[in-house]
Amino acid sequence: MDRRTLRMKTLLLGATGQIGNAFAEQLPSHWDIISLGKKELDLRNADNIPSTVFKFEPELIINCAAFTEVDLAEKKKNECSAINHIAVHELAKTSKALGARLVHFSTDYVFDGCQALAYSEQSPTGPLSHYGQTKLDGENSISDTGCEFLIFRTSWVFAKNGKNFIGKIDKLLRDRDEISVVNDQFGAPTSASFIAKIVLLSLLRSNLSNGIYHLSSAGATSWLGLAQKYLALCLNESAENRQYKCRKIIGIPSSEYQTA
């Protein structure tokens, strides 16, 4: 039977985040949807996951919850591991027990960034940060359980809500005459709305088997290139009467970037 005719019982986790909010806006209205944010299910405490998930008996679990602040992850390693690895493993085990399918989101930070060409799903992983390592650990823990799963590795996610590079840059562009942005890291800026749209199309068409898939927009740029493009677009949108002080963006290497 076509999934579009079913009342798919779906548990959406991380519903208030960037990707979660995009799913909340796009999930089919005829599906039976339960949306949980951090207040309803805090993934820092994995012991609560089985009882909470079993209570709803979902057929599909979409996990959009994650610890995503790369720099902060180095200072909060236990919390990052708890959310990105331990909780994900518990979700996968619970999905297996329920016979539910788990949709999970990972990142291009599972790679070391040294490859000149675009990474494929078969490319060797080699995370350089604690954040990247926890996301890779989460991937492996899902596949190890034998549950039904789809893992999507995304890149430089942005949305109108939530914490992301665009939001941070917007504030800096308003407040400062000149800013410095890293120019030697490259990725594919990808909107949360696009991610939700493609994943839902795949679910509705039932055309993906268990596995890991790369999902991002076409092309690539640096953080510097993205900041410059954003400023140019904002300066052209005079109708919104935005006030930006910044007129100069300087490119710097990652080695000169100072974290807060």
Each predicted region: which residue ranges?
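Mid/C-terminal beta-alpha module of Rossmann-like enzyme folds, strongest
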Residues: D175, I198, R205-T259
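Adenosine-cofactor binding site in Rossmann-like domains, unifying the SAM/SAH pocket
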Residues: H30-S51
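N-terminal Rossmann NAD(P)H-binding glycine-rich loop of SDR-like oxidoreductase domains
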Residues: M8-P28
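NAD(P)-dependent short-chain dehydrogenase/reductase
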Residues: N140-G187, S193-L201
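Active-site "gating" loop of Rossmann-like NAD(P)-dependent oxidoreductase/epimerase domains
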Residues: F67-V70, K75, D108-L128
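NAD(P)H-binding glycine-rich loop region in Rossmannoid oxidoreductase-like domains
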Residues: A46-H85
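Active-site helix of classical SDR
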Residues: T134
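NAD(P)-cofactor binding segment of oxidoreductase domains
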Residues: K75-V103
